[in-house]
């Protein structure tokens, strides 16, 4: 097989969520090699019966700072049921097991993202067993974004496994495997089916990436349920209150914001209040969709610093929980 016909992430069960809007690969020139979702061919365990958090809030703090982990967790805790720890290609932090331990000590329930980008299978197994041993129940299993060309070019990218195979590994060691899906990434018709294939691999929960409108999530969920989806789904709400926090979201692979809402928030007399209100309104609409069991409060939220952003996301979470009670 030629290099042009191989996935640079060595994926077997693609396509990943980083496919560009024009169908191009995120890591090299040329189209993604996957024209449709590859059916899962491995063991098909029954999904673990789990309850999705109503509010799952993105967690971001100063890297490698134990004190800031605790401080940020204290801000977020009153407005969420769990926190989602990302793993960004340009922002390394403590190893997953250590981060999970710090967050448990801080009194929050962590969902830890585990990526195949920087770990071979042995290290992935170590992290999964380590997380399970300290009491972290849920791991978001991702293939991982490709590292930017100017981000540590001296470091290799591993990709021993892809997301679905990591899901299978996680389920085999007793970890609750959560998975992402990007409804707006090509090929669009394959995305609901690919989520079902992840369920067959052992996923028990799903987190959907941002889309421009709740109606798009409704269409996605209808197609996914028709294809056999039965696991709880958490839909993302974009939280932004200034140009920088909006731009960060729009710069992520496969992520789109509603242009009208973005203009209304950024042009408001009080962008913070407008951003919070827009996020809560979107969450309310998403929770009415069949199969959506929770909300991922996501985004930088503010360019004024991580603690200000955490306070904004905590307020969004508090309002979502108050309206749902």
Language model features by range: what are they?
Residues 1-45:
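Cysteine-cluster motifs in flexible loop/terminal segments that predominantly coordinate metals
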Residues 62-76, 96, 121-129, 187-197, ...:
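Short, acidic/polar
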Residues 49, 73-78, 97-109, 128-136, ...:
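Acidic (Asp/Glu)-rich catalytic clusters
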Residues 61-63, 144, 154-184, 226-282, ...:
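Active-site pocket-lining/capping segments in soluble small-molecule metabolic enzymes
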Residues 45-82, 93:
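Conserved N-terminal beta1-alpha1 strand-loop-helix module at the mouth
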Residues 66-67, 89-103, 119-127, 145-169, ...:
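Active-site-adjacent beta->alpha loops and helix N-cap segments on the catalytic face
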Residues 53-60, 81-85, 110-114, 139-141, ...:
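Hydrophobic faces of well-ordered beta-strands that scaffold small-molecule active sites
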Residues 5, 86-88, 116, 180, ...:
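Glycine- and other small-residue-rich loops at beta-strand/loop junctions that grip anionic moieties
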């Amino acid at each position: 097989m030629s290099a042009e016909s191989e996935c640079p992430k060595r994926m077997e069960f693609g396509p990943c969520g980083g496919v560009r809007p024009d169908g191009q690969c995120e890591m090299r020139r040329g189209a993604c090699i996957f024209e449709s979702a590859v059916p899962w061919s491995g063991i098909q365990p029954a999904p673990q019966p789990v309850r999705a958090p109503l509010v799952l809030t993105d967690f971001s703090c100063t890297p490698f700072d134990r004190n800031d982990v605790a401080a940020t967790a204290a801000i977020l805790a009153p407005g969420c049921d769990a926190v989602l720890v990302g793993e960004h290609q340009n922002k390394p932090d403590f190893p997953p097991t250590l981060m999970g331990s710090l967050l448990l000590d801080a009194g929050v329930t962590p969902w830890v993202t585990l990526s195949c980008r920087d770990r071979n299978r042995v290290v992935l197994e170590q992290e999964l067993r380590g997380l399970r041993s300290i009491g972290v129940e849920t791991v978001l299993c991702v293939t991982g974004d490709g590292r930017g060309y100017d981000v540590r070019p001296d470091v290799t990218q591993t990709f021993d496994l892809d997301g679905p195979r990591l899901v299978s590994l996680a389920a085999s060691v007793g970890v609750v495997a959560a998975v992402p899906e990007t409804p707006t990434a090509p090929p669009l018709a394959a995305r609901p089916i690919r989520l079902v294939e992840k369920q067959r691999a052992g996923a028990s929960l799903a987190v959907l990436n941002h889309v421009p409108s709740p109606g798009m999530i409704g269409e996605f969920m209808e197609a996914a349920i028709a294809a056999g989806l039965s696991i709880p789904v958490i839909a993302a709400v974009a939280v932004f209150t200034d140009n920088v926090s909006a731009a960060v979201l729009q710069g992520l692979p496969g992520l789109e914001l509603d242009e009208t809402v973005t203009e209304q928030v950024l042009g408001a007399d009080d962008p913070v209040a407008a951003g919070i209100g827009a996020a809560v309104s979107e969450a309310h609409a998403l929770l009415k969709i069949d199969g959506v069991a929770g909300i991922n409060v996501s985004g930088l939220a503010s360019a004024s610093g991580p603690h200000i952003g955490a306070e904004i996301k905590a307020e969004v979470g508090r309002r979502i929980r108050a309206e749902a009670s």
